[in-house]
């Protein structure tokens, strides 16, 4: 972990990239930016560990971050993948001595913006609409967590893999002449952990989808969704 100076952020107002701050005018954004601490992490480095005291709002500025828990069997379970503009630690804003109930690891080189609980309280008092946006995001995450739990409990591997590709397509995809090109935020092992299958299973299912003409695999880090309708049929 490295502390970094980020004067460019202060002039470009990087906080405007964060959905919960998007409605603020330039003066209020400047106040937010003045309270931000900037940190950088290398790929694989822990940003926080389950059980650590949570006393700040952490915003992803660059890169991807995975949130994980350890199962009773001692295996890693990825519960969420965060991208620039996403955040965690919001529950600490409303609870005293809140502890992280997950660990966060950098999936790539990562830069974060951290706002202390005290700084966020000041921001929320001056801009109460941000509280509503945070609670809306928390509600969305609870629904996603329920969907993930149901997916892991009831759906077979074909549905899980298709759902994962669809999710990544929505979050990381962009349209090309060949279809929706997706830059995968994680490797095969992490993808397998995310949906509760083995690495061999996810490789086999991806090959099956490619052979069916639904997707094309471009190395290990990119895929192209060639037929979204047929992908939905697998779900």
Language-model regions, residue ranges each:
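Polybasic "coupling" helices that flank or enter modular domains
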Residues: 125-196
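Cyclic-nucleotide recognition modules
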Residues: 29, 80-143
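Short aromatic/basic micro-patch
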Residues: 57, 81, 106, 114, ...
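Phosphate-/nucleic-acid-contacting segments
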Residues: 170-235
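Cyclic nucleotide-binding regulatory domains
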Residues: 20, 45-108
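Structural motif
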Residues: 64, 109-111, 214, 221-222
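Cyclic nucleotide-binding regulatory module and flanking cytosolic helices
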Residues: 1-43, 92-95, 126
């Amino acid at each position: 972990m490295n502390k970094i100076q980020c004067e460019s952020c202060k002039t470009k107002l990087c906080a405007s990239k964060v959905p919960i701050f998007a409605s603020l005018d330039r003066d209020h954004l400047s106040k937010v930016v003045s309270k931000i601490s900037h940190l950088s992490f290398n790929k694989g480095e822990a940003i926080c560990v389950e059980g650590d005291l949570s006393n700040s709002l952490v915003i992803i500025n660059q890169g991807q971050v995975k949130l994980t828990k350890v199962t009773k069997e001692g295996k890693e379970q990825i519960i969420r993948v965060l991208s620039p503009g996403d955040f965690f630690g919001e529950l600490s804003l409303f609870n005293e001595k809140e502890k992280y109930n997950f660990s966060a690891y950098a999936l790539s080189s990562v830069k974060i913006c951290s706002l202390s609980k005290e700084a966020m309280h000041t921001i929320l008092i001056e801009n109460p609409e941000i509280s509503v946006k945070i609670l809306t995001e928390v509600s969305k995450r609870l629904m996603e967590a329920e969907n993930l739990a149901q997916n892991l409990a009831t759906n077979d591997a074909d549905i899980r893999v298709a759902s994962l590709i669809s999710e990544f397509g929505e979050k990381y995809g962009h349209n090309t002449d060949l279809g929706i090109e997706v830059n995968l935020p994680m490797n095969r092992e992490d993808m397998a952990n995310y949906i509760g299958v083995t690495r061999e299973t996810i490789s086999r299912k991806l090959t099956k989808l490619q052979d069916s003409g639904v997707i094309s695999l471009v190395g290990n880090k990119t895929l192209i969704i060639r037929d979204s309708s047929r992908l939905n049929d697998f779900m």
